Amino acid sequence: MSLGMLSPHLNTPPPNNQGILIGDKVYSEVFLAIDNSIIPEDRLSTTPSMLDGLDHETETDLRILGCERIQSAGILLRLPQVAMATGQVIFQRFFFSKSFVKHNFEIVAMACVNLASKIEESPRRVRDVINVFHHLKQGKGKKSTPLILDQNYINTKNQVIKAERRILKELGFCVHVKHPHKIIVMYLQVLECEKNQMLVQTAWNYMNDALRTSAFVRFEPETIACACIYLAARVLQIPLPSKPHWFLLFGATKEDIKEICINTMKLYSREKPHSEQLERQVEKRKIFLEEARLKARGQNPNGTPALASINGFSPASKPSSPRDVKMDDKSPNSKLKEPENRQLFAKSPLNGSIKKEDGKVFQNGKNHSRSRSRSTSRSPHRHRRSHSGTYSSHSSHSPSPRQKARRPSPISQLRTDRDRPSETSRHSNKRRRSRSRSRSNSRERVRDRDHIKHKQERSGSGHHWDHRDRERDRSRDHGRNKRQSRSHSGHSHSRHRR
């Protein structure tokens, strides 16, 4: 059955034990064959699902349920029995390499049906496969609701396509399956029992039921065919040659046939698996593995970093963290400046005048009115800063309206002289006035410049605009002179009348 190998001589290892490098592995020989791939015994005892925490019974139920879904979907899709058998064998092979916890068995079953239909040259659309599995999931005896073509359907379709690629990659594109269907008919012809239709059909049925077990990934198809014929003959009580045993002629052993028959008969005494219960168990294991993975990384289940220490240290329990800012505490500069400000300025909400702490009132000047307007701002931030005396911005506040000057009495004159602002504050007020005047003058210059520029642009477009402007200016001057002459004449007449 083997086609050959890549070494120079057939069935001889390469010289000097030099293997063939494929990827990151070194292989001594490469055989191209159409034989079924047999899983070794060491991989059967510890499957990936068992390593993830699933028990043997749960894994067996999941395998049986997945194969039943593939068989039922193939019947509804009108696939040949060979295609359904190929899908079940691929399903069994894949989950001896991957875990049921990390891969959804229903998505993998859809991908196996889709892939098997292509292998056996009877392809079906992915949409039809998804619709059939949706119908089977709703259960028998219940009203079937059609699948809505929404975002959930698109996600399922993409998952099926990705699962099909994953199966091909994991199996190394060795998805050919040699089925024992033809072998059964050939062996019965050798035994001269091919005319017994009951025996042929019973052996065929046992072979289809054996697809739910691991027999097709553990034994050769010839051994499986002999076991199915042996089991059907025992049930129907049909005698077959026993001295020597007839199956020894076809290369099968008594131990292998016995194991295949026992595993097949266990299916009929086994309780039917419940998909909801199995899905809940798989989900629990998935959550447990995710929490264990996050715990190994030092994170909580919600993804936040976990800090494990003896004293139960937490950044929030730090007594004096540099990020904790107490609003009641004030800087030493504000504590020093606060009594001075209280002594200089005591606000009166009634008349806007400034009181000293001894209760005496005097009329405030221009500088005090500016400080009062800043301190009575609506913003609490500005009020706090102006009250503490640590912030003074004169450009952002407009001066208060001037009050009418009153002639003070001699006693109040002495008080005002004593509390009169210094020369520096007076010069600062002059500086402010000069700044405001310079700003207003600069604004007027900008306006005049823009007006002249606009005129020049209009004049550049054509001389008729300049002519119109001159005529308009002359008419305005003429009208203004007329009004002035009338007003002068009116004044003169009124004088003569008087």
Curated annotation (Swiss-Prot):
Keyword Repeat carried by entry: yes
Annotated Basic and acidic residues bias: 321-341, 415-426, 441-478
Alphabetical list of Pfam families matching this protein: Cyclin_C, Cyclin_N
GO cellular component terms, A-Z: nuclear speck; nucleus
CDD domains for this protein: CYCLIN_CCNL1_rpt2
Region span, Cyclin-like 2: 182-266
GO term, biological process aspect, one: regulation of transcription by RNA polymerase II
Family: Belongs to the cyclin family. Cyclin L subfamily.
Cited function: Involved in pre-mRNA splicing.
Protein name per the record: Cyclin-L1
Organism: Danio rerio
